[in-house]
Amino acid sequence: MPKSTDIKSILILGAGPIVIGQACEFDYSGAQACKALKEEGYKIILVNSNPATIMTDPCMADATYIEPIHWKIVKKIIQKEQPDALLPTMGGQTALNCALELNRRGILKKFNVKIIGATIDAINKAEDRKLFEDSMKKLNLKTAKCGIAHNIQEALLVLKNVGFPCIIRPSFTMGGHGGGIAYNQEEFEDICERGLKLSPTTELLIDESLIGWKEYEMEVVRDKNNNCIIVCSIENLDPMGIHTGDSITIAPAQTLSDKEYQIMRNASMSILREIGVETGGSNVQFAINPKNGRMIVIEMNPRVSRSSALASKATGFPIAKIAAKLAVGYTLDELANDITGINTTASFEPSIDYIVTKIPRFNFEKFLGCNDRLTTQMKSVGEVMAIGRTFQESIQKAICGLEIGSSGFDSKVSFADNKQDIIKIRHELKDAGAERIWYIGDAFRCGMSVNDVFELTSIDPWFLVQIQEIIQLEKKIIQKGFIGLDYNFFYFIKRKGFSDLRIAILTNKKEEEIRQLRYELNLHPVYKRIDTCSAEFSTETAYMYSTWEDECESHPTKNTKKIIVIGGGPNRIGQGIEFDYCCVHAAQALREDGFEAIMINCNPETVSTDYDISDRLYFEPITLENVLEIVRIENPKGVIIQYGGQTPLKLARQFEKEGIPIIGTNPDAIDKAEDRNRFQKIVTKLKLKQPLNATVLTLEEAHKKAIEIGYPIMVRPSYVLGGRAMEIVYEPCDLDNYFKKFLKNNHITPILLDQYLNYAIEVDVDAICDGEKVLIGGIMEHIEQAGVHSGDSACSLPAYTLTNKIQNKIREQVKKLAFALSVKGLMNVQFAIKNNEIYIIEVNPRAARTVPFVSKATGLALAKISVRVMYGKTLSEQGFCKEVIPSYFSVKEAVLPFDKFQGVDPILGPEMRSTGEVMGIGKNFSEAFSKAMLGSHTNMKKSGRVLLSVRDDDKNSIVNLAVKLQKFGFKIDATKGTSIALKKSGIMARLVNKVHEGRPHIQDRLKNGEYSYIVNTTSCHQGMKDSQLICRSALQYKVHYDTTVNGAFATVMALNEEPTENIISLQEIHKKINLIN
C-alpha cells in the first residue's frame, strides 16, 4: 500500500533537553523522522526546546518551534498550524507523556489530530504497569511477581507479597528515574516516597528481585500488514539490577541458545501485536534466570529508544526512518534498504558478521559525595560503541574509545598489598561501580577463577572466559617483551583488540616505538563494511570499522578533495551534543561544496554517526592509532579537529608531528591560546586586561602567588574542558585541600591561579575570523555572575543589561585577539565585566558549546560558515560580514542532574555539571527567560511563601529583591542575618531557624510544603553546610531555588510573563533579523 493521502501535515514532538536517561539518541531519531517524512512531501511541524539538536535546524521542518514541550504550548501550536497527525514516538518519554496529556484533555479530538506511530491505547498498555501485566497474561508470558501502588500504604501491602530485596519503578518515567532496589523497610519507604512524587500518574510498580538474572533486549519493527522483523538482539553483559543504560551491552546476543532466541523472538512479535503497536519500532526487554532458564518479560517501549539508536548503528538498519515511513502507511516490503539499494527491502532482517560492544560513560567525579554504585536508576551520561570481529576485539576497542585515559584492561589496584587488593577487588565485583570491568581483569591477575568472579558478579561465564584470556595474553606479552613481537604474535594480539598504546605499556616502550615496529612489519588493519547482510550483497554505502584480516573493503575513492572531520567521542559533561552538531554541519557544508566528507566517531547516539551524513563513515575510537590508519588509507587534503571538543584537539600536536595537514586554525595558534604564558604576552601586547593570574607546579608556589593575587582565587588545571577540577578558593587551607585532591587524582599538568572577580558579569562571544575580517556571531550575557561555569549559567542574546559602549569595546577586543592568534575559523572568547572594566577570562580558538544556540538565535549557521573559511572561502565571498542583532531575545538555560544524585552539593560553581540545555525565545528578556525556565522543568509558582537566606555580600541586593517579591504577593521568610538586613530597610520577614538552630527549622517547613521559592547564596565556609542542606531539600520537595542573586532577579523578571501565551516558529523569527555594520 502507498503512503497515506489523508494526511498533509505532521506534528513531531522532540525529547527536549539532554538529561540522564534521555540523551541525543532522540535527536538522531527525530532528525531521521523529519527527513524521511519531508521527502515524502508532508508538511513537518516540529516542537523541541533543545537548540543543540540537528532536528531543530530550520531546514529540517517547515515550521520549527523551539518551545517548551508542554501541553499548553503544543495546544497553541496545534491551533495555529492545524496538523493532521501527531507523531509522538520519536521524542522519548517526554513526547509520549505530552501526547497522553493532550489526549486526556481532549485537545487531539477537538482539533481532529490523529496520532500515528502508536495509538493512545498502545502507549497506555505498554506504560501502565497493571495493563501491561494483564496483556502478558493473555499471551501466557511470565512477568515478575509484582504489585501496583499509588501511595505508601498500598506499597507496604505489595511488599508483604513481594518481599526483600525488591525493585521499585515509577510509571511513565525514563532512565529508571526515581526507582531503586530496596533491601530494608527504611530504603523501601524512602524510594517509594520519591518515586510517587516523580511518577506523573503517582503510580509505582514493585517487583520481586531479579538481581543476577541475565538481561536481553529485542528491537522489533512492525508494519500495518502485521509483518514483523527483529532488527537486532542485544545482550546485557551486566545482569539484572543494573539499569540497561548503565550496562555494557553486546549485539548480537552471545549466550542465548537458538531455542531461547526463537522463543524470545516469537514472544517479542506477539507482544507488539497484543499491545497494539500497529506500526514502527519497539524495544522489548527480557530476563532469564541462569539457574533454571525461567524467562520473564520485563517491559517494552512502544517507541524508538536508546537501544533503537544502538541497534540502528550496530546493523545499519535505520529504525527511526523506517518507523516514520511505516507510520504514514508504507509496509516493510515497500521500503528499500538504503545500504544495499535495490538488492533488498526493509522486510529483510539484518544479518551481521561482527560483534558490537557498547560501554556507558560516567561522570561521577563531577558529583562528589554521590552514590556511585550502579542500580536500577540510570547514572551514565554517555556511551561509546565499538565494532570488531570478536568480542575481545570489540570490547578492547570500546574501552579505548571511552576517553578516560584507558588503553585496555588497565589495572585498578597497585598489587603492593595483595590482601587489601583482593578485598578491594571483591567489593568492586560484588557492588558494581563504573569501573567493574577493569576490576574483573584485576581479579584474574590476582588468581581468582572464572567461577569465583561469576559468584560475585553474576556475569555469564562465557564473557568472563573471554576477559580471562585477554589477561593471560597480557602476561604473555610482558614475558615476551618488545623483542618477542614478531609478525605472527603481533598480528595475533592485534586481532584480539590490543591497542598500540596497551602493548607499549605492557612492553615498557613508547607508543611511537610500537607503531614504528608495526609499520616495519607491514601490519595494518583492514576495513569492513556495515551492510545489514553479512556481505551477501554489494553496497555503495561506506560505513566501516577496522579489524585485522586479509581483505580490505574500504575502497577509498580517488577524489583529491577529501577532508576528514573528527568527532567528539562519547558524551560527557563539558563535551556533549553541541560539538556533534558542529561536526554534522561541517560534513554538510563540505558535501554541499563538492568535497568528500569523511567522519570518524564512536558515539552511537549521535547524528554524526548516521551513515548518510558523510560520504564515508569510520566508526572507530578517536585515538592517534586509529586516525593515522584512516589518514594512511584515505590520503585526505586535511583534517578538521576544532569541532569535536577536546577529544581531537588534544591530538593536534601529534597530528602535526606526523605531517597530517590540519584545516583551519593551526596547532600553534591553539597552543598560544591555551598556554598561559604565551597568551599573557599577547594580551599585554594588545594592551588588554586580564584578571591577575599565575601558573604554578607546586603547592609552595601556589601559596606565594595566591598572596600576590589576593584571595579569593580561581584554581584549575590547564587544558581541561567543562571546568573540570575547577574551584574557587577563599583561604590558604582551601588551597592545601585542593592540591591534596589534585595530586591524589594523579594530575600532572600545571595549575592555573586566577583572581576571582566577585560580582562581575560574564560574557561569551562566538566569532569567526578568516584572517582579514571577523564576524561576531553573538554576544551573550550570562545571568549568573562570574564564578558559575559558563556551561551551567543561563545566558541571553542579545545582552540584557550591558551598555552599547561596553558591547562595542568587546567587539573590538575580540577582533584584536582573533588577528593576534591567527585564528582561521571559529573562536569563543569569555569576558568578565566589573565596574565597566573588561577582563579577558579565556579564548578558545575552536567551536564552543554555544555555537548551536547562537546559530538558532541569529539565523547564521556559524559552523558551516566557519568550515568554509577554514578551507579558504573568505567571509566576504560567502556574504557574511555583518553581525546579526535579533529583534527578539533568546535565553539558553542549563539543565542539571542533581535529582539523580542525592546527597550531592547542588550549589553552582566553576566546575560544569549540567547535562543539557533549553532555549526560550520571547519578545523581551523576561518572556524568553520564563520559557527557558518552563522548558527546563523549573517548578516556579507565582505566589506563596519565599525563603531568603543570603551571604553578607548579598544583603544589600536582597532588599530590592524582597520588595519585588512582595509586589507579586509573596510572603517572606528569612534566616537570622538576612532577616536583620531586611528589617533595617523596613521589610518584615518571618524568622526561620537553620537546621542547627532548633525546630521548626527550614527542612521542617519545606517538608510541610510551606515554600514555593528559595533564594540561598553562600561563600567560603559561611553556612556552606546549611546551604547545601537547604538546596538538597528544595530539590527533594520540588521547590525552585536560586543560588545567585542575579539568578533570583532574572527569576522575578520572568514572573511578569506567561510562558505559554505566545508562540513563534524559528522560520518566522529569522525573517525579523536586523543587520548592523
From Swiss-Prot:
<feature type="binding site">
    <location>
        <position position="299"/>
    </location>
    <ligand>
        <name>Mn(2+) 2</name>
    </ligand>
</feature>
<feature type="domain" description="ATP-grasp 1">
    <location>
        <begin position="133"/>
        <end position="328"/>
    </location>
</feature>
<feature type="binding site">
    <location>
        <position position="830"/>
    </location>
    <ligand>
        <name>Mn(2+) 3</name>
    </ligand>
</feature>
<comment type="subunit">
    <text>Composed of two chains; the small (or glutamine) chain promotes the hydrolysis of glutamine to ammonia, which is used by the large (or ammonia) chain to synthesize carbamoyl phosphate. Tetramer of heterodimers (alpha,beta)4.</text>
</comment>
<feature type="binding site">
    <location>
        <position position="842"/>
    </location>
    <ligand>
        <name>Mg(2+) 3</name>
    </ligand>
</feature>
<comment type="pathway">
    <text>Pyrimidine metabolism; UMP biosynthesis via de novo pathway; (S)-dihydroorotate from bicarbonate: step 1/3.</text>
</comment>
<dbReference type="Pfam" id="PF02786">
    <property type="entry name" value="CPSase_L_D2"/>
</dbReference>
<feature type="binding site">
    <location>
        <position position="757"/>
    </location>
    <ligand>
        <name>ATP 2</name>
    </ligand>
</feature>
<feature type="binding site">
    <location>
        <position position="299"/>
    </location>
    <ligand>
        <name>Mg(2+) 2</name>
    </ligand>
</feature>
<feature type="binding site">
    <location>
        <position position="842"/>
    </location>
    <ligand>
        <name>Mg(2+) 4</name>
    </ligand>
</feature>
<feature type="domain" description="ATP-grasp 2">
    <location>
        <begin position="680"/>
        <end position="871"/>
    </location>
</feature>
<keyword id="KW-0547">Nucleotide-binding</keyword>
<feature type="binding site">
    <location>
        <position position="241"/>
    </location>
    <ligand>
        <name>ATP 1</name>
    </ligand>
</feature>
<comment type="similarity">
    <text>Belongs to the CarB family.</text>
</comment>
<feature type="binding site">
    <location>
        <position position="285"/>
    </location>
    <ligand>
        <name>ATP 1</name>
    </ligand>
</feature>
<dbReference type="InterPro" id="IPR005480">
    <property type="entry name" value="CarbamoylP_synth_lsu_oligo"/>
</dbReference>
<dbReference type="GO" id="GO:0004087">
    <property type="term" value="F:carbamoyl-phosphate synthase (ammonia) activity"/>
</dbReference>
<feature type="binding site">
    <location>
        <position position="285"/>
    </location>
    <ligand>
        <name>Mg(2+) 1</name>
    </ligand>
</feature>
<feature type="binding site">
    <location>
        <position position="830"/>
    </location>
    <ligand>
        <name>ATP 2</name>
    </ligand>
</feature>
<feature type="binding site">
    <location>
        <position position="299"/>
    </location>
    <ligand>
        <name>Mg(2+) 1</name>
    </ligand>
</feature>
<feature type="binding site">
    <location>
        <position position="787"/>
    </location>
    <ligand>
        <name>ATP 2</name>
    </ligand>
</feature>
<feature type="binding site">
    <location>
        <position position="176"/>
    </location>
    <ligand>
        <name>ATP 1</name>
    </ligand>
</feature>
<feature type="binding site">
    <location>
        <position position="842"/>
    </location>
    <ligand>
        <name>ATP 2</name>
    </ligand>
</feature>
<dbReference type="GO" id="GO:0044205">
    <property type="term" value="P:'de novo' UMP biosynthetic process"/>
</dbReference>
<protein>
    <recommendedName>
        <fullName>Carbamoyl phosphate synthase large chain</fullName>
        <ecNumber>6.3.4.16</ecNumber>
        <ecNumber>6.3.5.5</ecNumber>
    </recommendedName>
</protein>
<feature type="binding site">
    <location>
        <position position="210"/>
    </location>
    <ligand>
        <name>ATP 1</name>
    </ligand>
</feature>
<feature type="binding site">
    <location>
        <position position="299"/>
    </location>
    <ligand>
        <name>Mn(2+) 1</name>
    </ligand>
</feature>
<dbReference type="GO" id="GO:0046872">
    <property type="term" value="F:metal ion binding"/>
</dbReference>
<feature type="binding site">
    <location>
        <position position="285"/>
    </location>
    <ligand>
        <name>Mn(2+) 1</name>
    </ligand>
</feature>
<feature type="binding site">
    <location>
        <position position="129"/>
    </location>
    <ligand>
        <name>ATP 1</name>
    </ligand>
</feature>
<feature type="region of interest" description="Carbamoyl phosphate synthetic domain">
    <location>
        <begin position="555"/>
        <end position="937"/>
    </location>
</feature>
<feature type="binding site">
    <location>
        <position position="844"/>
    </location>
    <ligand>
        <name>Mg(2+) 4</name>
    </ligand>
</feature>
<feature type="binding site">
    <location>
        <position position="842"/>
    </location>
    <ligand>
        <name>Mn(2+) 3</name>
    </ligand>
</feature>
<dbReference type="GO" id="GO:0006526">
    <property type="term" value="P:L-arginine biosynthetic process"/>
</dbReference>
<keyword id="KW-0028">Amino-acid biosynthesis</keyword>
<keyword id="KW-0436">Ligase</keyword>
<dbReference type="Pfam" id="PF02787">
    <property type="entry name" value="CPSase_L_D3"/>
</dbReference>
<feature type="binding site">
    <location>
        <position position="830"/>
    </location>
    <ligand>
        <name>Mg(2+) 3</name>
    </ligand>
</feature>
<dbReference type="GO" id="GO:0006541">
    <property type="term" value="P:glutamine metabolic process"/>
</dbReference>
<dbReference type="InterPro" id="IPR036897">
    <property type="entry name" value="CarbamoylP_synth_lsu_oligo_sf"/>
</dbReference>
<feature type="binding site">
    <location>
        <position position="299"/>
    </location>
    <ligand>
        <name>ATP 1</name>
    </ligand>
</feature>
<dbReference type="InterPro" id="IPR011607">
    <property type="entry name" value="MGS-like_dom"/>
</dbReference>
